[in-house]
Amino acid sequence: MPNISRKPPPRFYSPSHSPSPSLYAPIQSPPAPSYDYHANPRTLNPFSDAREVGGYAQLQGEDQMTGAPLYQPPYAPQLLVAQPTPVSSRLPFFEAALARARGIQTPSLPEAPTPAYAQPLPSYLPPPDPNHPDLSVGLTQANTVRYAINPRSQLKEGSRSPSPFMDDSFVYNDAAHLYNVEPDVEKALLGSGLGYESEKRVESSMGFNDNDGDLSVPQSFGGRPPSWEPSGILDEKGEMSTTKHFGPAPAGRVGRRAHNAAGYRRIKQSATLDENGFFAIEMNIPTRLAQFLPIKGVEEQKTTRYTAITTDPDDVPAAGFRLRQNMTSPPRQTELFIVITMYNENAELFCRTLYGVMKNIAHLCGRKNSRVWGKDGWQKVVVCIVADGRKAVNPRVLDCLAALGVYQEGAMTNTVKDRPVTAHVFEYTTSFALDGDLHFKYPDKGIVPCQIIFCMKEKNAKKINSHRWFFNAFAPLLSPNVCILLDVGTQPAPKSIYHLWKAFDVNSNVGGACGEIATFKGKTWRSLLNPLVAAQAFEYKMSNILDKPLESLFGYCTVLPGAFSAYRWIALQNNGDGRTGPLASYFAGEQLNTGKADTFTGNITWQKIESCVSKSAKPKANWVLKFVKAAVGETDCPDTIPEFIAQRRRWLNGSFFAAVYALMHTNQIWRSDHSFARKSALMLESVYNFLNLIFSWFALANFYIFFVILTSALEGSAFNVPHIDVLNTIARYGYLGALVGCFIFAMGNRPQGSPWKYKAAIYFFALLTTYMLVAAVLCTVQAIKNINSPIFAKMVVSLISTYGIYVISSFLALDPWHIFTCFIQYVLFSPITDLLLLKLISMFHDLSWGTKGSDATQASDLGAVSGVGKHVEVELVTAQQDIDIAYQDALDNIRLRGSKVDSAESEPKKEQSEQAQKDTYANFRTNVSIAIMLVQKKRDDAKS
């Protein structure tokens, strides 16, 4: 629509009518009577016979007041030369006040009005919204005072002139004019509707004199103090405020500003629940995102569907909830259903995982000769992102989802007809991606559409509950062939998902599979400079070379890592009674929160142990578990000792109780439909797991015995090392003292609260390991000299069985690079297993999933859906302008990478402060306990 000018033209007099001497003098006469709008319609046509001049309707012919003849020049009106005034209104307010105080006479410049024409909006600007005015022009000299003082007066054109000398608005009675003739590029870009060398017209107010209380207009030109309230802003004490030019100062902390002063406004509107009572709404995507869509008109890419779920995840399918894939005609067949679980991980880790998944989908679409995949293969893959708690999600992750078009905060609500919302579900098919560096990737880079379901739980109910939403709420609606589990931070290689799916496709007996977990090394493998990361990289690689292939050969993997694993959907189904089976036994671990589960049941559910056993030993089935080496997933491993200990403590709890549970239920293998050879192989694997459990239990004592034997060998006459016995005695007592200290640390101190205690113990064990390796090398050299002695054979066998197997197997697997980059770090950190074992034993009672808490209260910051029946009222952010503003804010936050956030986001929470206080008390208790033990030890030595 055209941008209509709102300023009336100036009053022009005919030369034949002799003006009075007071015409060019300052006008002191009272204001003219009000103009009757209905009797004299206004027009913007400069060639019309009737024109509004100064609040009167004048015809070409005679003056309505004096009867004098008038004429109006069509293009070159006569210029009016104004006389000097005491204070010019063209000065900014503060300079005008200063000039008035000093008594300075400032001349007024002549006014050169030109006819006003309606200026169309620029083509690059969106169409105006009548409900959301354009607030791009800020508060200025003229309109600020009117905002603050006279609510009855009209809002005249505000000045944005950069000149400190004069203002470019000139007020004459009730008509305001712009007299500048120089092009103002700033006004043109801001959409003020001004053309070069043109004038913008302002309509007069409805019978009010707009100069009443306008401090920007001098009294000689009709301006005067307000007759009904003081010219200024009164503060709380009733005194004049000094901020009347800019408005009152905001109270309290000012949050992050939006692009528009309107912010994200929720507008109350009526809505209709669906036939099953769910509140679902289709939200338009941002305008900027719609402009870059590769294919226009696709409904699933034009809108984002939001649904507020108020039921338990187990009751979602029975309640009649449907996804977009169920609404198509015909319903889409889902081959792969991928879940990405997250808590509070940062945006880089999230985008790295999602980008890896989208590259895998692009690879599936590129397999043109496949009977399953091809050009439209993306329609057979659905990605489900489950966030554990709305308040716990990283805000930058939500910005990334909003940038992709998946998430819109303005659509969410807290309750639906007094029923609390348990999960917010967003559905959208995005055509773009964000890589790990938060850079957009478009379809020209190989990105294909991706169907995304974003389920954000209202409360933090831990990871096992996130899997329950995936398996019990969404998977039954899609009935996928294969379900893939991913954690945020694990990036699958471009072909990994295909290789995982292929393992199920070529062998119908495969019920579960896992890929190779590798550490994320970064560019040029710079992460390996951290010895802790290098040690984990070596451990992961050796597990994928030795352990996983052996277990896959037998047909049963003790643990399928939740970070990167896949399951056949029909293999996960429970038994006929519905109370037993893989999923039922797995989700029994959620009873930990209700106090209905014992310690043993709580620990075995950590690593999905029962799920693995139930699939392999499922009655009347012959499912096997496979390891797929070609499917590689890079995970972000812990790079600090506190994070490493917290993670491995959970893993050790799961693996330890996994072995115990598997051994206790070995007889269930004979109830399955496996062949006799397969059952025999599984029994042999059970024996292997039993021996491995025994060695793990005695690993602490075995390491100490090995240390004592090697260091004591240096005391022999063959080495002739002076005073080596003193050094060995100190090392042994230090070893035992460190073990006792680790027991105390493990039982009373968190790794996050006492990092230096754990670091000191680990570094001391690494020093003792170095001493032990030196002793082993010296003993080996001495044994080589006596090659015919029995000790040589024992030494060679022991070294080959421990370290030689790593080197030989790595070269046989044609993957030896970790031997050259990570072997030394792994050997030095090998004693950390002692600390982890002590931590495991000391924390058997702790069934929490790390440091992640849970919410207990229902929030009420999003509004509510209220009404009777299916017709309800709800407050939503549905205006396109506000949606575009929110989208631009998300893009800005991604670009800033979270460098500028609200201070409240960085403030420590109350729970964190309380935990820090508890850690301080625990450190004091541990220090006192260690001091008492040392004093008691010295006292016993003195007595002896």
Swiss-Prot record:
Query: What protein am I looking at?
Result: Chitin synthase 6
Explain the consequences of disrupting this gene: Abnormal capsular morphology: lower fiber density, abnormal fiber distribution, decreases capsular diameter. Decreases extracellular vesicle secretion. Sensitive to high temperature.
Q: Where is the composition biased (Basic and acidic residues)?
A: 901-917
Which organism encodes this protein? Cryptococcus neoformans var. grubii serotype A (strain H99 / ATCC 208821 / CBS 10515 / FGSC 9487)
Q: Which reaction does it catalyse?
A: [(1->4)-N-acetyl-beta-D-glucosaminyl](n) + UDP-N-acetyl-alpha-D-glucosamine = [(1->4)-N-acetyl-beta-D-glucosaminyl](n+1) + UDP + H(+)
Q: What does this protein do?
A: Polymerizes chitin, a structural polymer of the cell wall and septum, by transferring the sugar moiety of UDP-GlcNAc to the non-reducing end of the growing chitin polymer.
Lineage at the top is: Eukaryota, Fungi, Dikarya, Basidiomycota, Agaricomycotina
Enzyme class, broadest EC rank: transferase
| Gene Ontology biological process | cell wall organization; chitin biosynthetic process
For region Disordered, the annotated ranges are: 1-49, 901-920
